[in-house]
């Protein structure tokens, strides 16, 4: 059967024409369609798009809400250490060594910081019982839990004054075992820490843990847990507000966790020069900074009128923000729009670029047909 050359050419053109007319629909790669429902079975699940405008930025809606910015409950002045259950006390009555019994000698490991005690781990001491008391010669049972060293000293002095003339008493805490905090996360030496006579501030706790890991730790997301309540503290934000981080006083049972920086990363994808993940600096990252870290929008393939920020919402459906960045003035709006952890910044491709990509896919398919037509001719 004879097939004419014009017929072959018409067939080739017909095969190419259909996908070309639907180039945008069949173009490879991602594309954001604001009219496409999130759930194919629910036509009403079209995402709501919020325009990034000067009013949005001025109204503060473009700012990231700060978690538990009210840190007043954590701020306190340091007070003298108060003795607790399990602490070991040294009680010395000068010129009366008979008041120190050999049976009151305890072995204290190097985990406890006993300063200036002749370098020996075996020291005479009195362990505070679970009831919060100790027993001392000629003084009987003394309640010491919740009291300072000076308060205990004064009571013992009064109690033994009837048998010891002008007693000179010294009371020290040898081992601090009653109150502990726990430091976890991105610090060099996470673990348990005992609260002692040095006020356990946030700065002190982090220093004892070796400091925040500079490569993986996020100093803008330090989580403090106390009694079921949590605060997320930012060192830069505290200092910006004029609050000394050393004024954050920790209590026994507190948990301090330094969150990893990786948890705060933002994804920049689409038609940018370098699709990548971007980490915030000092807990803050704007849309303009994220685009800048990715090399900016691609001058060849991007449609700067369609810059989107996709944010996961608590209720499940994503929040979508749109910026028309065709004009460089729009970058000022982008600088005022703060990104949140795990936001996705997407720059759409231009219509001509999508059409060109379809052509590039069709050319390898159409070339053999065109070659066959030439041979038949």
UniProtKB/Swiss-Prot annotation:
This protein's UniProt keywords: Cell outer membrane, Ion transport, Lipoprotein, Membrane, Palmitate, Polysaccharide transport, Porin, Signal, Sugar transport, Transmembrane, Transmembrane beta strand, Transport, Virulence
Cell compartments where the protein resides: Cell outer membrane
Signal peptide: 1-23
S-diacylglycerol cysteine lipid sites: 24
Record keyword Signal present: yes
Domain of life: Bacteria
Any one Gene Ontology molecular-function term assigned to this protein's record: porin activity
GO biological process per UniProt: monoatomic ion transport
GO cellular component, one term: pore complex
Lipidation (N-palmitoyl cysteine): 24
Membrane topology, from the record: Multi-pass membrane protein
KW Lipoprotein (keyword) present: yes
Pfam families associated with the record: Poly_export (PF02563), SLBB_2 (PF22461)
Similarity comment: family membership: Belongs to the BexD/CtrA/VexA family.
Protein's job: Probably involved in polymerization and/or export of exopolysaccharide EPS I which functions as a virulence factor.
Protein name: EPS I polysaccharide export outer membrane protein EpsA
Organism: Ralstonia solanacearum (Pseudomonas solanacearum)
Lineage of the species this protein comes from: Bacteria, Pseudomonadati, Pseudomonadota, Betaproteobacteria, Burkholderiales
């Amino acid at each position: 059967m004879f097939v004419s050359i014009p017929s072959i050419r018409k067939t080739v053109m017909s095969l190419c024409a259909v996908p070309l007319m639907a180039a945008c629909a069949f173009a490879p790669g991602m594309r954001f369609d604001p009219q496409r429902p999130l759930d194919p079975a629910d036509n009403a699940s079209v995402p709501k798009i919020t325009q990034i405008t000067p009013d949005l930025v001025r109204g503060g809606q473009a700012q990231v809400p700060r978690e538990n910015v009210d840190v007043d409950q954590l701020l306190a002045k340091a007070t003298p250490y108060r003795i607790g259950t399990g602490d070991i006390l040294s009680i010395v009555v000068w010129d009366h060594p008979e008041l120190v019994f050999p049976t009151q000698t305890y072995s204290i490991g190097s985990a406890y910081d006993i300063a200036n005690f002749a370098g020996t781990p075996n020291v005479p001491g009195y362990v505070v019982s679970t009831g919060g008391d100790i027993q001392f010669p000629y003084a009987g049972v003394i309640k010491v839990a919740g009291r300072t060293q000076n308060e205990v000293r004064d009571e013992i002095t009064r109690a033994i004054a009837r048998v010891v003339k002008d007693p000179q008493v010294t009371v020290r805490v040898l081992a601090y075992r009653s109150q502990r905090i726990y430091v976890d996360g991105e610090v060099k030496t996470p673990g348990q820490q005992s609260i002692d006579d040095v006020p356990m501030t946030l700065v002190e706790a982090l220093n004892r843990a070796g400091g925040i890991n500079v490569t993986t730790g996020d100093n803008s997301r330090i989580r403090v847990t106390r009694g079921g309540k949590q605060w997320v503290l930012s060192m830069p934000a505290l200092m910006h507000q004029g609050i000394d981080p050393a004024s954050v006083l920790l209590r026994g049972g507190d948990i301090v966790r330094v969150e990893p920086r990786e948890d705060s990363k933002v994804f920049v994808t689409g038609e940018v020069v370098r699709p990548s993940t971007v980490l915030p600096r000092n807990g803050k990252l704007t849309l303009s900074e994220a685009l800048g870290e990715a090399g900016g929008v691609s001058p060849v393939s991007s449609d700067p009128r369609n810059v989107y920020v996709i944010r996961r919402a608590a209720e499940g459906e994503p929040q979508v923000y749109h910026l028309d960045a065709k004009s460089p003035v729009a970058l000022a709006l982008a600088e005022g729009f703060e990104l949140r952890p795990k936001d996705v910044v997407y720059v759409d491709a231009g219509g001509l670029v999508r059409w060109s990509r379809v052509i590039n896919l069709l050319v390898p398919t159409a070339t053999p047909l065109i070659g066959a037509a030439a041979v038949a001719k």
